[in-house]
């Protein structure tokens, strides 16, 4: 099993030194879903939410969050993102919205945390904008779908994970 990299030999937390790592193209894709009442889903789908364009604002929130990840996750490196793409898939039958965030950089560390942070903040933004009509919304199934680049190479989620 791979050792945890954010702890030194004495068990103290530290930020990993990536200074000697090669700068490579890195990509990460993460996803997550929010499920809501059918009436709430219709408000979002039709653009009739009282607070405005829910998905448009959630998209901007996700992009902003990816850029602030190092401010939120204590041992995460601040990195220069070269691309952030945010997509939403609406599932009317399930009254759910799936957010997918793709992050890219050319750097010495991966962008998985940025993609995951973007997804979470997008879902939280949807919740915030719709909570007046539906406090029972459920966010879940947040996960990394794939990552590419870097020393550890490529990784793609399996259906079970």
Curated annotation (Swiss-Prot):
What's the catalysed reaction?
(8S)-3',8-cyclo-7,8-dihydroguanosine 5'-triphosphate = cyclic pyranopterin phosphate + diphosphate
Q: In which pathway does it act?
A: Cofactor biosynthesis; molybdopterin biosynthesis
The EC designation for this entry is 4.6.1.17
One matching Pfam family: MoaC
Please name the catalytic residues of this protein. 128
Keywords from the named record: Lyase, Molybdenum cofactor biosynthesis
Could you confirm whether the keyword Metal-binding appears in this record?
no
Gene Ontology molecular-function annotations: cyclic pyranopterin monophosphate synthase activity
**What is the top-level taxon of the source organism?**
Bacteria
What residues does substrate bind to? 75-77, 113-114
Q: Name one GO biological process term.
A: Mo-molybdopterin cofactor biosynthetic process
Per UniProt, subunit arrangement is: Homohexamer; trimer of dimers.
Q: What does this protein do?
A: Catalyzes the conversion of (8S)-3',8-cyclo-7,8-dihydroguanosine 5'-triphosphate to cyclic pyranopterin monophosphate (cPMP).
- In which family does this protein belong, per the annotation? Belongs to the MoaC family.
Alphabetized PANTHER family for the sequence: MOLYBDOPTERIN COFACTOR SYNTHESIS PROTEIN A
Q: What is this protein called?
A: Cyclic pyranopterin monophosphate synthase
Species the sequence originates in: Cupriavidus pinatubonensis (strain JMP 134 / LMG 1197)
Cite the source lineage: Bacteria, Pseudomonadati, Pseudomonadota, Betaproteobacteria, Burkholderiales
């Amino acid at each position: 099993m791979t050792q945890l990299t954010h702890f030194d030999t004495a068990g103290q937390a530290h930020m990993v030194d990536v200074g000697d790592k090669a700068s490579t193209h890195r990509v990460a894709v993460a996803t997550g879903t929010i499920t809501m009442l059918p009436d709430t889903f219709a408000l979002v789908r039709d653009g009739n939410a009282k607070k405005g364009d829910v998905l448009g604002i959630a998209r901007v929130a996700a992009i902003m969050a990816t850029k602030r990840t190092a401010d939120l996750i204590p041992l995460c490196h601040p990195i220069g993102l070269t691309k952030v793409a945010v997509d939403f898939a609406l599932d009317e039958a399930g009254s759910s919205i799936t957010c997918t965030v793709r992050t890219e950089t050319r750097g010495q560390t991966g962008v998985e945390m940025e993609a995951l942070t973007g997804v979470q903040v997008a879902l939280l933004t949807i919740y915030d904008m719709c909570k007046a009509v539906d406090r029972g919304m459920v966010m879940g199934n947040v996960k990394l779908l794939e990552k590419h680049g870097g020393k550890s190479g490529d990784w793609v989620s399996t259906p079970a994970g």
